[in-house]
């Protein structure tokens, strides 16, 4: 399953909008979480309000994409945030940029807490 998630992330990162990562060398930070379908709408609202809105206000952030899919009673969430540089991510996340920064209520919603996020260098972004 992890390989399928990685493949999905690479595809989604490649499809990121141009205004999020205009300059070569921008960094995409990907987080993945899974929530029971019955709580997905509530979690999405919480994630947008308490996570995404706050990410967008952090200096160095270029934007955020949210992807979801429901399958077999579970909704997967992928959040890809775009940053000018790894230094901007370090200013937000601290020295260990691979460590997930969970929201306070994530344990209430998420099936499991993933310990790490992933980072990708944005090479191209050309969605119309």
Regions found by a protein language model. Give the residues of each.
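Positively charged n-region of N-terminal signal peptides that target proteins for export
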Residues: 1-4
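Bacterial N-terminal signal peptides
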Residues: 6-14
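Enrichment for repetitive, rod-forming helical segments
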Residues: 9-10, 36, 125
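Glycine-rich beta-strand-turn "strand-cap" elements at beta-sheet edges
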Residues: 15-28, 65-73, 101-128
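An amphipathic, aromatic/His-enriched active-site/gating alpha helix that lines ligand/cofactor pockets
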Residues: 21-22, 49-62, 82-119
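Short, well-ordered beta-strand segments in beta-rich or mixed alpha/beta enzyme
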Residues: 26-34, 63-95
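N-terminal targeting signals for Sec/Tat export/insertion, comprising classic cleavable signal peptides
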Residues: 27-53
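Short, solvent-exposed loop/turn elements at domain surfaces
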Residues: 39-42, 55-56, 90, 126-128
